[in-house]
Amino acid sequence: MIISEPFAVAYALDKIEHSLVIDIGAGTTDLCRVYGTVPTPNDQMHINFAGDHIDAQIITEIQRKYAGAQITKDMARRWKESHSFVGGAAPDDPVIVDFSIEGKAMSLDITDCISAACETIVEPIVASVKELVTGSNPEYHDAFRRNVILAGGGSGIIGLGALIE
């Protein structure tokens, strides 16, 4: 039997009773409401707002702020993995990184770019959570809202759990 990754997360954590797992990977965010049995397709959602989307948004935000900025996907991914945050969870020090603008080496502040890029996944995730919760038995709505589990690489985004709540 093949099970979904979010269900595997809930099972590994022994949280298979009325949990809602949000597994933020590279290509997709997979959401699953867990009732204690293997979930059906109606208990799961998959959206394309995940790590790769954030990487692309970081590039877009930096190029919008710094015209001529030369950024690769790997650079954006490294910065995301080292500095990602949302909402009021900004780091104490600004996020200063090195990159080229029209061939000239620069060290520039991308704090607001990181935040804006990471926040682009919040609304699609919240909308999906609402859909899964409201589509479940009303008796379990509160339990699902109280038992949200973030998993995957995107779960490391500082402040994400609080913003989703």
Model-derived regions: residue spans:
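Phosphate-binding glycine-rich/basic clefts of nucleotide- and phosphate-handling proteins
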Residues: 36-122, 130, 140-141, 146
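Conserved helix-loop functional segments at active or binding sites
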Residues: 8, 131-138
